[in-house]
Amino acid sequence: MSTGSFLPGKVIANENLSQFSPEARKLIAEKTGVQTRRHAVETECTSDLAIAAARKCLQKIEFPPENLQGIVLSTSSPDRLLPATATRVQHELGARSAFAFDINSVCSGSSFGIAVVDALIRSETCKSILLVASEMYSKILNRKDFTTYPFFGDGAGAILFQAESGSSRGILHSCLATDGSRNDIICVPGGGTMLPFEKMPGPRSAYFRMRGEEVFAFSMDRGPQIILRLLEETGVTKEEIKCFICHQANINILHGIAGLLGIPKEKFIVNLDRYGNTASASVLIALDEAINEGRLVQGDLAVIATFGGGLSWGANLIRL
């Protein structure tokens, strides 16, 4: 197992968001904990971030890209409607022997991706597979919309999984869930077959939308539930978990989940203060940083928990 992450170099602090009033800018940190976020430059696209994170991941253990057998890319902000953004990642990495495809479960994408990778390895479809989560919300947000624009950032994370017979490391268990009756709570309304470009009432239909209060309530409800379900199904206690890596949506959600589960908040990895909400990339970026900082070492158990559009939510138990 190896990890990598990449954040674009453009740092946007709350005070730089001059389109909002000083009073509104003060509320950003109070409501969410976000102090800064990273934005890509005009010439960068989602696959560029994915490629950079993937290269870091592979170079860390000197793994040749041509030995990859599969690439799964989680993104809800793809380069184009089609083809899969993963195809450009495969080409630029030189992973000529790897199949490549995208998945889109919005902020839950990494949990769903981990479960897919686990199934592919267990079915012996492949022995080495790269999961990448890459998001560039800065280009799908309305910069004047205070309900979304200040809270998101761009970034990518990657993790390489390899089949190892007899090993106790890797993906131990996954739990996934969806409530499609609320699929409109987090969405980009226009651009698909439901609302084609030529029928869009205006450019605002192409922007990301979110009903924040409903998302907060959903996360506080289903986040703890999916973590408890994961622990119950595996027989692992919360005391045995070294770190909880939850989707980096809001510091109040993270602290709320910790309180509801009776887990010290120090066990929760937090980077949203620096990067904002990087959607499906958030947990893989946080995992990479936790490993690089020595908070997770070989043999440690970690829980990854995500919640987002669809509505969807998931959790994974991994051993480093």
Report the location of each language-model feature.
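Anion-binding (especially nucleotide phosphate/pyrophosphate-binding) glycine-rich loop
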Residues: 60-96
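Flexible, glycine-rich active-site loops centered on histidine and acidic residues
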Residues: 120-156
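Claisen-condensing/thiolase-fold acyl-transfer catalytic domains that form or cleave C-C bonds
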Residues: 47, 51-54, 58, 77-78, ...
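Acidic-glycine-rich active-site phosphate/pyrophosphate-binding loop
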Residues: 21-30, 80-94, 131-137, 193-201, ...
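Condensing-enzyme catalytic core mediating Claisen C-C bond formation in acyl metabolism
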Residues: 1-42, 145-217, 221, 225, ...
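Short beta-strand segments
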Residues: 1, 74, 104, 129-135, ...
